[in-house]
Amino acid sequence: MTCPVLDIETWFLQWDKMWGYEDYGSSYLAVTGCGPTCLAMAGYYLTGDTNMTPDRIAKFAQRGGYYEKGYGSSWTLISEGAGKLGLTARELPLVKQKMTDALEAGNPVILAMGKGDFTTSGHYIVLTSWNGEAFTVNDPNSRIRSSQLWTYEQLENQIR
């Protein structure tokens, strides 16, 4: 089974000059803004709402208490905050088939990543397609990692 590539042309980078130097928590969006940036990518893709930008989602996250000092964005920004933005979010079990089913249905999948290829501590990424063998990823912090294909086995032990 292959899934169409979700047309997430709005691949936002957290360090984009348009918002990278906006305050987010104890630092800048460029440094700690992967959560709001991923939610902005998914939200913009799903709704077409041009107000779904990383800086606006970051402000929403801070006002809503979704930023945890010393950590960054709480998972509740995705699991609960998305609903307050008019989106529907649901948590998936760590099962490849569930992820590919979501993509096949046209839904981006936001993953919280632990130490590994994407981060030394914590990071959010967006799965955008499955070609039957590997996923494509929108990494808000890396053009290089976003241009690679990732097998489930490569990602599995890094997903929190």
Residues covered by each model-derived region:
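Conserved active-site-adjacent core of cysteine acyl-enzyme catalytic domains
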Residues: 43-44, 48-160
